[in-house]
């Protein structure tokens, strides 16, 4: 898969900007707060219809404007493909594939695949469970576009159920409606749990292998999906039964706390190094190694499932890695994956590597092509 060009209009700090990608590797260099991450965010948005930096479309639109557009031309297995999105909070999103408007997000997702690795991902180990759930969900959205509908249906059931819990204790309690939302929560929640659990099972051996390489065979990484619902033998029937039972058991406490306490919206992912919780014991260096192993696993999994090489988006991460890990990452990338990476300095990139890359200078929402020497001089 190759992203040939990108056009941004009123997206973040870009007023109107076209970029043509001319090499498998593109380095976006510039000072802080110039728009480097914003450009990667636009590509991430085309891949997942989400940003890991914000949940609100409004934030993506340039201040003082009503709408933003992202347009991309790519080549997928030799076939050209045009993608376009228009974000307008007042009237919603418009998604187009090859000039035709698509109604379902599932028809847009999966057209462009990308694996993003940013310094925010370093939070995957120590951050909140929501960060790890979002990570799984973003991968699933690319592997299985219909997952977006499943998430939406689940979130709707959760919102309705929480609204009912807020009314609990008042007159006119509607038990039938409560049971109906419980059923929706259990059916869709079970589907989500099973998909996430299967994803972990597929990522685990890949991440384990990478981790072994990165840690010089010193540590063994294990991944587990930590659900509030006992998974039993992992079948739908077993999870549905356990989920229903957990809801019945926790009914009193949910009524007291007025919120839903059981379901995939509360689940987590566990990482262990040599059987010890990475969240509690991993050093900064071990966390970086672990996250790099996860990202390399993600890259391999997306590639094997979609049958094409995803784009790799590296947002300011090379500086976070030591020379050995940088070397491994750059070697894996080779020319196999089209890679867009941001940096404030070109120094960490070896000279031969820089010479092969397209270097773009980002300054206050404008992008200019520069030679290696020119970028170095102004660096
Ligand atoms: N909706 C918006 N409208 C206008 N400007 C915005 C909007 N959202 C973000 N910005 C601006 O974009 C800039 C941040 O860009 P970005 O996050 O891409 O930085 P960066 O170049 O990657 O820098 P760093 O190296 O610090 O990560 C800031 O100046 C911010 O004010």
Swiss-Prot record:
Disulfide bonds: none annotated. ATP binds at residues 30-37. The keyword Glycoprotein does not apply. One of its GO terms (biological process) is SOS response. It is found in: Cytoplasm. The RecF protein is involved in DNA metabolism; it is required for DNA replication and normal SOS inducibility. RecF binds preferentially to single-stranded, linear DNA. It also seems to bind ATP. Belongs to the RecF family. This is DNA replication and repair protein RecF. It comes from Thermosynechococcus vestitus (strain NIES-2133 / IAM M-273 / BP-1). The lineage of its organism: Bacteria, Bacillati, Cyanobacteriota, Cyanophyceae, Acaryochloridales. The gene is recF.
């Amino acid at each position: 898969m190759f992203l040939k060009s990108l056009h941004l209009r009123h997206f973040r700090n870009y007023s109107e900007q076209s970029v043509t990608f001319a090499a498998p590797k593109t380095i976006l260099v510039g000072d802080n707060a110039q728009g480097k991450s914003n450009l990667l965010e636009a590509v991430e948005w085309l891949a997942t219809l989400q940003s890991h930096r914000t949940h609100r479309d409004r934030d993506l639109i340039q201040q003082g404007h009503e709408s933003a557009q992202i347009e991309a031309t790519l080549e997928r297995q030799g076939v050209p493909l045009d993608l376009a999105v228009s974000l307008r909070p007042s009237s919603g999103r418009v998604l187009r594939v090859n000039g035709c408007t698509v109604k379902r997000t599932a028809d847009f997702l999966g057209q462009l695949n990308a694996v993003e690795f940013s310094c925010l991902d370093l939070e995957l180990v120590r951050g909140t469970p929501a960060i790890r759930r979002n990570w799984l969900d973003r991968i699933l959205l690319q592997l299985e576009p219909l997952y977006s509908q499943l998430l939406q249906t689940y979130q709707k059931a959760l919102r309705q159920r929480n609204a009912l819990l807020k009314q609990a204790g008042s007159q006119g309690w509607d038990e039938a409606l409560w049971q109906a939302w419980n059923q929706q929560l259990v059916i869709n929640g079970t589907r989500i749990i099973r998909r996430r659990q299967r994803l972990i099972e597929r990522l685990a051996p890949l991440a384990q292998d990478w981790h072994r390489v990165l840690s010089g065979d010193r540590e063994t990484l294990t991944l587990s999906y930590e659900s509030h619902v006992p998974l039993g033998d992992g079948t739908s029937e077993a999870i549905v039964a356990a989920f229903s039972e957990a809801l019945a058991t926790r009914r009193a406490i949910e009524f007291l706390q007025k919120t839903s306490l059981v379901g995939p919206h509360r689940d987590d992912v566990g990482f262990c190094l040599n059987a010890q919780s990475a969240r509690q014991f991993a050093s900064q260096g071990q966390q970086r190694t672990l996250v790099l192993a996860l990202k390399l696993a993600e890259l391999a999994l997306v590639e094997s499932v979609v049958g094409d090489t995803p784009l790799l988006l590296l947002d300011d991460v090379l500086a976070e890695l030591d020379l050995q890990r940088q070397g491994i990452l750059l070697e894996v990338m080779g020319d196999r994956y089209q890679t867009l990476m941001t940096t404030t300095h070109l120094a960490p990139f070896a000279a031969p590597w820089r010479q092969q890359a397209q270097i773009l200078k980002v300054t206050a929402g404008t992008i200019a092509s520069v030679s290696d020497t020119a970028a170095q001089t102004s660096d």
